[in-house]
């Protein structure tokens, strides 16, 4: 038989086999979905009605008793034929091929919504537990300072308590002697007897504590002390003073800055340093220019130390102990590390670390110049 005829005969057989496989796959999928629907409806019927905030313990998962008017859940698939009843009963016991996976919640509620739910539930649990506010009294100041509230509020409360304490301490140190303003008392002589009474007749003094005079006598004096303490230890006044100090310094610096519109030539000429004065030719201490100059000096010092190390490793030692190398050899080796070899050599000679002839070195012309390491 020719190969073309075999392919023609095998074509209908393959298509029929493909149709049978597709139909079988569809039937199995439908049965799997039907089995999943039955199991899910049974689980939903067995679950409790719901959860209430007042109930702290979960209800037992007991199946509900079927009432006389309760009907079984309806299935979504049509009734099977008589011939397929046996197959359906056998396949119902098989494990479903549908994959199950728990889906986590990705939508998160806002911060104030979460806080409201947690506060409501915590308040409900505290009330159910029987803990009342009357049984456990708490100081308001301690509750504010020790609670996990806003740090700004806690800082303000702490500053207020410290200011009041300092004010009372100042009042205790001054200890003014209060005298009654009543005319009848002065005429009767009771006030003088109390003031002239000797100290040995007085009652034993109680432990040291903050003296608080009567409000009717010391109202004006206490207000004055509180105002003084508030002005002395006020955070706003301190911040205002620092800001004013910075503003004054900025105005003064702008008057001395030649690039500023507020530059004062006469003031700059009268305050400038002359040659020989301390700090002449150097930036102002504490300025950004001084910091950059310090970093530049440290960088140049590291470059000089690296140059001396390279000369020491590649040079030949003489009998007298000196280390020498020619400029051509050093340039060929050092140009791979840095292209500023000439500038670093000039700086090292200024510090007395190396020595060579001439004021300047040129590649090609001064390759024979000998460089001696002095350290």
UniProtKB/Swiss-Prot annotation:
Residues 294-375 are annotated as: Actin-binding 2. Its main location: cytoplasm. It is found in: Cytoplasm, Myofibril, Sarcomere; Cytoplasm, Cytoskeleton. GO terms for cellular component: actin cytoskeleton; myofibril; plasma membrane; sarcomere. Residues 234-279, 346-375 are annotated as: Interaction with actin. Residues 1-20, 38-99, 173-204 are annotated as: Disordered. The modification Phosphoserine is found at residues 150, 182. Residues 1-11, 79-99, 173-182 have a biased composition (Basic and acidic residues). GO terms for biological process: actin cytoskeleton organization; positive regulation of DNA-templated transcription; positive regulation of Rho protein signal transduction; positive regulation of transcription by RNA polymerase II; protein import into nucleus; transcription by RNA polymerase II. GO terms for molecular function: actin binding. Keywords: Actin-binding, Activator, Cytoplasm, Cytoskeleton, Phosphoprotein, Protein transport, Transcription, Transcription regulation, Translocation, Transport. InterPro entries: Abra (IPR026111), Costars_dom (IPR027817), Costars_sf (IPR038095). Expressed specifically in heart and skeletal muscle. Residues 193-293 are annotated as: Actin-binding 1. The actin-binding domain 1 (ABD1) is intrinsically disordered, and binds to F-actin with higher affinity than ABD2. Binds F-actin and ABLIM1, ABLIM2 and ABLIM3. Interaction with ABLIM2 and ABLIM3 enhances activity. Acts as an activator of serum response factor (SRF)-dependent transcription possibly by inducing nuclear translocation of MKL1 or MKL2 and through a mechanism requiring Rho-actin signaling. This is Actin-binding Rho-activating protein.
């Amino acid at each position: 038989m020719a190969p073309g005829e075999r392919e023609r005969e095998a074509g209908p057989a393959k298509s029929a086999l493909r149709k049978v496989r597709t139909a079988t796959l569809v039937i199995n999928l439908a049965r799997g979905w039907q089995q999943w629907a039955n199991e899910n409806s049974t689980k939903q019927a067995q679950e409790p009605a719901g959860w209430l905030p007042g109930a702290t313990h979960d209800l037992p998962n007991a199946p509900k008793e079927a009432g006389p008017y309760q009907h079984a859940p309806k299935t979504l698939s049509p009734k099977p034929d008589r011939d397929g009843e046996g197959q359906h009963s056998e396949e119902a016991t098989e494990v479903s091929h549908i994959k199950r996976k728990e889906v986590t919640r990705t939508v998160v509620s806002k911060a104030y919504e979460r806080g409201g739910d947690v506060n409501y539930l915590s308040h409900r649990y505290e009330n159910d537990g029987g803990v009342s506010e009357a049984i456990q009294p708490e100081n308001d100041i301690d509750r504010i300072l020790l609670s996990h509230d806003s740090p700004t509020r806690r800082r303000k409360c702490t500053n207020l308590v410290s200011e009041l304490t300092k004010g009372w301490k100042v009042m205790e140190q001054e200890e003014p002697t209060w005298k009654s303003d009543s005319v009848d008392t002065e005429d009767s002589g009771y006030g003088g007897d109390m003031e002239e009474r000797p100290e040995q007749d007085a009652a034993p003094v109680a432990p040291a504590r903050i003296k608080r005079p009567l409000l009717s006598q010391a109202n004006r004096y206490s207000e004055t002390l509180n105002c003084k303490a508030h002005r002395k230890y006020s955070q706003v006044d301190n911040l205002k003073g620092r800001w004013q100090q910075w503003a004054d310094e900025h105005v003064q610096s702008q008057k001395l800055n030649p690039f500023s519109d507020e530059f004062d030539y006469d003031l700059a000429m009268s305050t400038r340093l002359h040659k020989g004065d301390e700090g002449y030719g150097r930036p102002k201490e504490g300025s950004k220019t001084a910091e950059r100059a310090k970093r530049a000096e440290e960088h140049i010092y590291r470059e000089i130390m690296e140059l001396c190390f390279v000369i020491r490793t590649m040079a030949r030692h003489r009998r007298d102990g000196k280390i020498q190398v020619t400029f051509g050899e050093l340039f060929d080796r050092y140009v791979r590390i840095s292209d500023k070899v000439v500038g670093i050599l000039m700086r090292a000679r200024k510090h007395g670390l190396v020595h060579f002839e001439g004021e300047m070195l040129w590649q090609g012309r001064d390759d024979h110049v000998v460089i001696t390491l002095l350290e």
